C-alpha cells in the first residue's frame, strides 16, 4: 500500500474545512419556545410531514385565560381563544430550515409567509414576510 502524499492530505483537509456545517436535525425545532414579545410561549409539534405551533401562554393569556383574538383582520375569527391558537402551520423541511409555511401574529392580526431556522441549541429564527423584502425576523429561545 502506498503512503498518502502530504498534498492529498492537505487537499482533503481543505475540503473538510470548507464543507458546510452540519445541518440541525429536523426535530430540533420541536418543543416550547419563548417569543420576544409579550412573554409568549409557543409549542411546536409535528403535524404530519409538517410542523405547527400553538400559543400556549403569554401576557394576554395570563391576564385573562379567556383572552380572544381581537386583532384578527377577519372579523369572524375575533372570538377565537388565544390559548392554544395555532399560529404556525404548513412548513416543510428544506435542508437546515423549514420553509413555505405561514405565521399568524395575534398582535396585529396578520398572517405572513415564513421561514424557520435553528441557530445552534439556543435559538430559533422565525422570519415572516408580507412579501420579500418586507420581512421581520424574531429570535425565539428554547424553554427547558
Spans of features found by a protein language model:
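Bacterial N-terminal signal peptides
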Residues: 9-17
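Short, exposed beta-strand-loop hairpins at the edges of beta-sheets
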Residues: 108, 113-117, 123-137
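Non-cytosolic beta-sheet module surface loops
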Residues: 34-35, 130
Amino acid at each position: 500500500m502506498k503512503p498518502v502524499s502530504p498534498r492529498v492530505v492537505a487537499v482533503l483537509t481543505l475540503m473538510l474545512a470548507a464543507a458546510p456545517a452540519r445541518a440541525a436535525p429536523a426535530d430540533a425545532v420541536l418543543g416550547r419556545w419563548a417569543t420576544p414579545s409579550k412573554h409568549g410561549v409557543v409549542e411546536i409539534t409535528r403535524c404530519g410531514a409538517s410542523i405547527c405551533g400553538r400559543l400556549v401562554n403569554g401576557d394576554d393569556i395570563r391576564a385573562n385565560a379567556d383572552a380572544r383574538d381581537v386583532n384578527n383582520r377577519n372579523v369572524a375569527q375575533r372570538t377565537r381563544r388565544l390559548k392554544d391558537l395555532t399560529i404556525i402551520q404548513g412548513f416543510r423541511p428544506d435542508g437546515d430550515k423549514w420553509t413555505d409555511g405561514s405565521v399568524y401574529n395575534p398582535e396585529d392580526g396578520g398572517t405572513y409567509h415564513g421561514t424557520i431556522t435553528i441557530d445552534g441549541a439556543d435559538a430559533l429564527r422565525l422570519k415572516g414576510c408580507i412579501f420579500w423584502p418586507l420581512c421581520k425576523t424574531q429570535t425565539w429561545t428554547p424553554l427547558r
